[in-house]
């Protein structure tokens, strides 16, 4: 082993990185389950509910357009009412199932190429994003830079607000950085529209001080894994000499005022990578993302997202990434009905365990019996927005 000199000690991670500060800025001081439980209590006790009913009528073949048109005219008062869905030309009565079905169809179709609202990179995630739980090649979506339907983007934010308020579970394929943007404080989010905001000071993401991390180079990996790998190998892991920067035309053009006159060097390459990622992920689509954020924050969340990070937010609306038979069984009310002389419920439990061997088998079962492909992070509890409660037979 070699003894550190003074210069080496100044740059060594042991002396330059505070794991406690990193945990605090990323919202990881409190465990995810505790944060979600505290948030659920806020929704139950603090958020206003209206006894009135908000009807919407949609068509299955154009559910995205119809839902966005309805939510575009909604204000806070509309979102606080109980939502009742009616499908055009159908006589079904919504006891909660049609609402879940509508959300499932909506978030399945909104990412379709012909809708034109969202885009994904061709190669998707690199599959090494850890806690996010993305597979290699899995495509995640961000608003299209070509989409001028800003009012629809704002309406989408209201849809997400309703999903959160009522405790629904959706299968949303948003890039994690979208959740991160929704969690930023207003000043930071607005500032990212001008040349992507601050550059941060580390390989990962900087700290915004509001419980979430600002957007940086590491966030690019879950959206465009191939570009992330290229920048990682050709810039981060390279010694940037003047000749190398000149050959690759590496400068800060479009990333800061007069950026075309600032050359990338070995000293500022991390700042460059953070700004480049912010420009790709946020700057180019800032109007669309800001509209979603505006719609989402129409409800008074107060400080209840302050300690959330993007993984917490994703779990809040999508439920746990991994679902096993035990989790599903825990959300079944086996005391409902008279099954004392029947072994049916035993067979149900065995059947669910067999579905673990089939890809998405449990999610298909949940979609069939509940209308949603997942289980809420806090379980199937009867609430104002979820009148059905646990699964029962």
Model-predicted regions and their roles:
Residues 1-138, 194-196, 200-209, 213-215, ...:
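Extended low-complexity, proline/serine/acidic/glycine-rich cytosolic segments
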């Amino acid at each position: 082993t070699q003894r550190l000199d003074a210069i080496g000690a100044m740059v060594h991670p042991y002396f330059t990185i505070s794991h406690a500060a990193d945990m605090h800025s990323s919202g990881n001081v409190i465990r995810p389950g505790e944060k979600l439980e505290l948030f659920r209590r806020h929704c139950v006790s603090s958020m206003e509910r209206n006894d009135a009913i908000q009807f919407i009528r949609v068509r299955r073949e154009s559910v995205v357009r119809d839902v966005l048109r309805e939510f575009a005219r909604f204000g806070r008062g509309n979102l606080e009412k109980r939502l009742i869905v009616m499908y055009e030309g159908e006589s079904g009565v919504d006891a909660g199932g049609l609402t879940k079905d509508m959300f499932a169809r909506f978030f399945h179709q909104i990412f379709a190429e012909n809708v034109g609202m969202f885009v994904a990179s061709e190669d998707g995630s690199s599959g090494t994003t850890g806690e996010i739980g993305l597979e290699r090649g899995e495509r995640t979506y961000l608003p299209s830079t070509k989409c001028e339907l800003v009012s629809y983007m704002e309406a989408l934010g209201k849809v997400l607000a309703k999903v959160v308020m009522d405790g629904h579970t959706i299968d949303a394929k948003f890039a994690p950085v979208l959740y991160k943007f929704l969690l930023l404080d207003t000043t930071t989010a607005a500032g990212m529209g001008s040349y992507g905001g601050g550059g941060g000071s580390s390989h990962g993401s900087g700290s915004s001080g509001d419980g979430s991390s600002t957007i940086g180079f590491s966030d690019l990996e879950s959206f465009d894994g191939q570009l992330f790998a290229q920048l990682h190998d050709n810039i981060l892991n390279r010694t940037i000499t003047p000749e190398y920067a000149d050959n690759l035309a590496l400068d800060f053009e479009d990333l800061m005022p007069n950026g075309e006159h600032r050359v990338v060097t070995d000293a500022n390459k991390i700042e460059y990578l953070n700004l480049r990622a912010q420009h790709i992920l946020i700057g180019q689509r800032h109007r669309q993302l800001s509209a979603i954020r505006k719609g989402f924050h129409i409800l008074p969340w107060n400080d209840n997202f302050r300690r959330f990070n993007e993984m917490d937010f994703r779990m809040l609306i999508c439920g746990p990434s991994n679902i096993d038979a035990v989790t599903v069984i825990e959300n079944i009310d086996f005391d409902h009905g008279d099954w004392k002389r029947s072994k049916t419920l035993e067979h149900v439990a065995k059947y669910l365990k067999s579905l673990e061997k089939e890809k998405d088998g449990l999610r298909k079962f949940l979609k069939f019996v509940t209308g949603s492909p997942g289980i809420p992070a806090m379980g199937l509890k009867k609430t104002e927005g979820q009148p059905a409660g646990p699964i029962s037979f």
